[in-house]
């Protein structure tokens, strides 16, 4: 009996979809305008299909993978259906590997069971929960001096907001962190993490001679000279720089964060070699607290994506970044302009476009939007966005009941702002706009079933019971380092 009911539900859903498509096609045909002003909506079928495997933008219809490589920008306030219409259906229907920013944890709960059934390797990065989290160590991925400098810069700028009245402190803090991370890279791998950078800062404040000895023994001449020039600062200035550095690394006083970032178990190449999904989770309330590490992760993943071209047999990689405005991603403008060449696509979800303007400035925010092939606007847009959309959609003319020619906007800003909850505007590349009908996942027989599959048991395979702190003996070496060939 259950099987018969299930089959009937599927048939009804398919029949309903066909009727909806026919109705929209006929309606669009009758509403076409062949006048001087002839703005009109396109039929969704010109870009979207149930049989594609790219980003799902309506809950049922998807872009092609090729179009998805050109990115998508989803804009809508809380509760309008960004997750239920776009994120869940995309996870249920797309192919390839995923990096998913999942602040609420809901995406993992309702998709991991199905993805595991499909053969996906499920990973979680949760800085507050070491027992289930994969390990991620930003220092281990900083291979070159420029990588180290970028990491130090992100730690300072993201943690402190880059809003210091005097940029001297942030600049010098970045330089000192770069020097300390570089000296740590000369030590055993278990000591190469930001927890131990923080320990070095503590020693500089209380026992600077021990750090002098470390540099004397392990630094090359260039690094040793840079360190000496730093400690030559006036004591008050040096204390201020150290304090700025410690504020940047304040997170690493948290034992959970220190454990998760002490080593690294995430192999970026896995995402190319087999179907893999990583959910980056932190509670919504703590999102700002953890955003430094999440931002650094995405920056380092962008470097991986843009650093090589995938082989034919390797997997596509898609990044679904919910609450993108909570992150500081300096490379994002470059990434959205170039990931298509690397068989990858980025979906950004924000509440309002002005959030991107606030983070990246007007020029870069416009660049990000321009490099997103699909731009999706849910109901409830701000007046500024709605007015801009009214101009973008254009105008059309018609004759009123008295035969007079009337010109009006395809949609006024009020009509855009007050669209029905089950409608959204899609503007894709050079194509005419689409007024899409939305179908949340829970109204789809298949997707609703997928969401109820149990979450697989998550457990970190490498349990670190303690943190490896730099041993005291390395600070006790004889400290008269001679500089070769320097007059």
State where each predicted segment sits:
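Long, basic/Gly/Ser/Thr-rich N-terminal segments
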Residues: 1-29
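P-loop NTPase motor domains
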Residues: 18, 22-26, 30-38, 47-59, ...
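Conserved ATP-driven motor cores of ASCE-family P-loop NTPases powering translocation/secretion/packaging/pilus
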Residues: 336-338, 342-428
């Amino acid at each position: 009996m259950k099987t018969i009911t299930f089959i009937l539900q599927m048939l009804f859903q398919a029949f309903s979809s066909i009727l909806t498509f026919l109705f929209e096609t006929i309606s669009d045909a009758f509403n076409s305008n062949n006048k001087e002003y002839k703005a009109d909506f396109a039929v969704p079928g010109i870009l979207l299909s149930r049989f594609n495997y790219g980003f799902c933008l309506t809950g049922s219809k998807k872009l092609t993978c090729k179009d998805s490589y050109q990115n998508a920008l989803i804009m809508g306030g809380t509760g309008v259906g960004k997750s239920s219409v776009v994120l869940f259906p995309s996870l249920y229907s797309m192919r390839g590997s995923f990096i998913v920013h999942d602040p609420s944890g809901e995406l993992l709960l309702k998709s991991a069971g199905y993805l595991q059934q499909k053969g996906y390797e499920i990973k979680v990065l949760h800085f507050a929960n070491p027992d289930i989290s994969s390990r991620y160590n930003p220092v281990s991925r900083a291979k070159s001096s420029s990588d180290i400098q970028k990491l130090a810069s992100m730690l300072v700028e993201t943690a402190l907001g880059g809003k210091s009245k005097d940029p001297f402190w942030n600049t010098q803090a970045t330089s000192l962190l770069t020097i300390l991370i570089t000296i740590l890279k000369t030590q055993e791998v278990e000591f190469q993490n930001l927890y131990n950078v923080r320990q070095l800062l503590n020693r500089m404040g209380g026992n600077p001679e021990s750090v002098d000895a470390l540099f004397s023994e392990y630094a090359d001449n260039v690094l040793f000279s840079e360190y000496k020039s730093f400690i030559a600062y006036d004591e008050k200035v040096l204390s201020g720089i150290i304090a700025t550095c410690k504020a940047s690394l304040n997170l690493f006083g948290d034992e959970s964060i220190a454990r998760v970032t002490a080593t690294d178990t995430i192999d970026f190449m896995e995402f190319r070699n087999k179907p893999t999904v990583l959910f980056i989770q932190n509670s919504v309330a703590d999102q700002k607290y953890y955003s430094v590490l999440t931002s650094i992760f995405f920056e380092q993943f962008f470097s991986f994506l843009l650093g090589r071209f995938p082989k034919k047999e390797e997997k596509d990689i898609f990044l679904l970044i919910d609450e993108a405005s909570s992150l500081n991603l300096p490379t994002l403008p470059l990434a959205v302009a170039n990931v298509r060449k690397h068989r990858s696509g980025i979906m950004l979800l924000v509440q309002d476009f002005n959030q991107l303007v606030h983070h990246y400035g007007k020029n870069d925010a416009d660049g990000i939007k321009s490099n997103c092939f699909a731009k999706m606007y849910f109901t409830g847009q701000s007046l500024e966005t709605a007015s801009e959309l009214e101009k973008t959609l254009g105008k059309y003319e018609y004759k009123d009941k008295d035969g007079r020619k009337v010109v009006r906007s395809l949609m006024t800003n009020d009509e855009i702002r007050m669209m029905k909850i089950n409608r959204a505007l899609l503007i894709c590349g050079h194509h005419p706009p689409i007024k899409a009908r939305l179908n949340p996942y829970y109204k789809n027989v298949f997707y609703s079933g997928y969401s109820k599959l149990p979450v697989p048991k998550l457990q970190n395979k490498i349990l670190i019971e303690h943190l490896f702190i730099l041993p005291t003996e390395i600070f006790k070496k004889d400290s008269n380092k001679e500089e070769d060939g320097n007059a």
